[in-house]
Amino acid sequence: MPASNDPVRYPKRPHVRRHGPAGYDDVESFRPWLRDEFQFRCVYCLEREVWTKPVAAFDIDHHAAVGGNPGLQFDYDNLLYVCHACNLSKGSQAVPDPLQAMLSSAVIVKKNGELEGKTPPAKKLIACLRLNRVAYKERRQLIRAIVSLASKFDLDLLAKMLGYPANLPDLSQLRPPTNRRPAGIRKSCYARRAAGRLPDTY
């Protein structure tokens, strides 16, 4: 499968945050920002909203535990968008930053769906979150098979599997008390779609 069409291939480069809302006093207020920030998928296993039921399936995770450092509770740069399964597996464990560790150069996704970590941080993350459980490996194989078949026989299905969700958040309508990176709103998926610059798939 071409790398451009591989839905379980990790990013090439470390993620640089484009949004910076601050001042909220509840974590849920960050959700629309995090959805857009992390492309509507889990930063750990790459599960996408369009493959599941996002309302119940995705959580907001504090990368560094809040206990002992309450200032991190509402720190946007400490928040991640993750699937519920990965969030449960992580729990309160201290793990490497997935935005730095889970890169295509550090994680090989084998044909059988198994993740092979090539660096110590990637290996630790894969082990701590148990990303090579049978269910995870079978899920990767299934998603790859669907995308492969759709690319040959059903381009509409391919667009759904690799496309953005319909309910993109309009971040320009949100009013956080402060925003350290306001320019990011113009780079949001909603804004790019409105300007005709959002790709059909990713």
State the predicted function of each range.
Residues 2-44, 67-74:
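Short, charged surface segments at domain edges that flank catalytic/cofactor-binding sites
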Residues 6-7, 50-51, 73, 77-93, ...:
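Short, surface-exposed, charge-dense and proline/glycine-enriched linear segments
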Residues 9, 13, 17-20, 54, ...:
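Amphipathic, alpha-helical segments enriched in basic
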Residues 30-57, 83-85:
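Short cysteine-rich loop/turn motifs with clustered Cys
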Residues 47-81, 92-108:
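Histidine-centered nuclease catalytic patch
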Residues 90-157:
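Conserved, surface-exposed functional patches that form binding/active-site neighborhoods
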Residues 128-202:
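C-terminal, charged low-complexity interaction regions
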